[in-house]
Amino acid sequence: MLRHYIKMAMRHLLKNKIQNLISIVGLSVGILCFSICLYCSRFISEVDSCFSNKELIADINLCTTRGDLYSGIPATTIEELRKLRFDEVQDFTFTVYPRERSYNVEIKEGKELPYDHLMTMEVDSLFRKVFTPRILQGSWEVASNTPNAIILTRSLAKRIFGESENPIGKRMILTQRLFTAPDTTPRTGGIAYTIQAVIEDIPLNTSLSFLEKLDMLTLNDSEGTLCPVCHHCIHRFLVYVLLD
């Protein structure tokens, strides 16, 4: 009986080839579009779901009297907010918009390889308390107290050092002069950074860098915008608070 039904179905398909082909293609396109829409809707709805404090994190924005948003918050405003000590707020953290950098990376003693277009975000020491990145190697505490400390993401650490090599303690030499760098920094860079930790990859659907893959974080960056000497000239930051 089953064979009879299969034969009848095949005869029907062969009898109306063009019509059935159009139906199959249309159904396939419909399923594909539905799958893409479902994926995109889940991608958007799960923004920041990787952060364990998601429900307690809020970002702070400045608006004009007309309601237009500024591109960031001045460092002086952040310092004033921290002094006010709101009862509803555990802590503040501020970051800088991610930007590409180029480095010569110490693979082993006496050997360096160039790596360009590494998407880098400068953060402060309270970033971990607010966003709770998972530490795979090294120590965030050590990085917080080390000048020019670098925290690699897992995928970048694997790409540069492979599975067996330990990246902690390796140096990365900046090969460019950042626009935020002091006047004493050469045009070719030459500033040394030290890898102090490796964290789990930060997904693309986060408010930190939506649809941009982060390769690394920097702390206590002498060439960046969070250093005190730069607050008067580069003064726009992204500010997040951890609520009680």
State where each predicted segment sits:
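Short, strongly hydrophobic transmembrane alpha-helices
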Residues: 12, 16-44, 55
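Membrane-proximal extracellular/periplasmic loop immediately following the first transmembrane helix
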Residues: 37-106, 114, 228, 233-244
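Mid-to-C-terminal secondary-structure elements
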Residues: 124-136, 152-244
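Short acidic/polar micro-motifs at solvent-exposed secondary-structure junctions
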Residues: 62-70, 93-126, 136-150, 175-193, ...
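Phosphate/oxyanion-binding loops and surfaces in catalytic or ligand/nucleic-acid-binding neighborhoods
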Residues: 31-34, 41, 47, 84, ...
